[in-house]
């Protein structure tokens, strides 16, 4: 089951986005993820081809790096 989650974040720059993406990859290497920092919501898009996206983990990683996120519906 393929799942895609899109998160609104307050990540503002490419360096911070890179750090967060690397940390997500360390915890969940099967996730395909990217940021769209041009979007007004500073979107983080995550795809998991083998199940659900662990939103709790994503929130924890964002918060650990002093950022916030919310799932876009």
Predicted regions and their residues:
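Short amphipathic alpha-helices in soluble, non-transmembrane regions
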Residues: 20-24, 56-64
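Helix N-cap motif at beta-to-alpha junctions
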Residues: 49-53
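Short loop or secondary-structure boundary microenvironments that flank
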Residues: 10-13, 48
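Conserved short beta-strand edge segments in small beta-sheet-based binding/regulatory domains
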Residues: 34, 64-73
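Short amphipathic alpha-helix segments
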Residues: 12-28
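Short glycine-/aliphatic-rich beta-strand segments at the starts of folded cytosolic domains
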Residues: 1-11
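RNA-recognition motif
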Residues: 34-40
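Surface-exposed aromatic
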Residues: 40-46
